[in-house]
Amino acid sequence: MALLDKWIALDIGAYLARFYDFSTQKEIVLKTIIAQKGSEVLGVSDQAIAYLYKDLDTIQIQYPISHGQILHSIEPLIHEGLDKLHAYDGLLRPSVLVSVPSELSQRQRELWQQAFLNCGVRKIEFISNLEVLQEENPCFLVHSGHSYTEIHICAYDKVLVSKTIYYAGVQVDEQIQRIVYMKTGYFITKVDAAHLKEMASDAFWQQKNILLMCYGFDSRQNLHPIQIESSIVWPAIEMVSSQISLWVKHCFDTLPASLQEYFLMHGIELSGGMADCFGPSQLISQNISCPVLCTKRGQYDMIDALKGVKSA
């Protein structure tokens, strides 16, 4: 890394945007949500969440990233993260190292690049999830985030399997929204659904059934308090976890017997936000009868891995 470069690592997912300054070793995490009123940006991350329950007719709540693709402008999010890192201070403009989905199209790369250039970034380098996570030894990688899951199997200096499926955290959240509506008649936001998922998962890890609370809208957009047991959320987690485990099993079954034996002994690596969630690791292990090695900071795996790509 050149001495005159100010490098920032970014992992901008559909749920969280993570920023890391290589020189100061400071890390910033924002929620990937923006509140707008017309063309005016009202808030980003937690500031945007404050608008979830007010002025619904005039304020737009945007979730700008899905499946690694830009749906709405991400420039306010980039500016906020870089500002919090003081990346614009001094004479040097920041350069960014950005993790992206392994199957991201060239058109989407161009959109990402233009967004960073519009934010005053000097240099942009992209690195795929597979490039970040791949190891020298044979590895069976399942990276399951908020909007997609990547499955990669690498051995003999080759990528033998590379598959992206659209079963991940957001699909769990959508099922939770549906379940809550069926049980209560109230609609809950994506943010509340994600919160219920996390709270229910924590309870399941502890083998408990707890009472979960949030707010929901009726048909007239009036807010009401909601209480449901965590067990009601389990079918949503189970459905998506089952799909992930079935695809992992399908990829496993394509391997030669020698590699199957290797992974039965050494295990499958599960990373991303869904590694934190109770369900995927249990069902994968049950389906293939092999150990599943979950990372310790699932939602921060990619930014943690990026820290080793460049040294300050």
Regions found by a protein language model. Give the residues of each.
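Nucleotide/phosphate-binding catalytic cleft detector across ATP-hydrolyzing
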Residues: 1-42, 46-144, 154-268, 275-301, ...
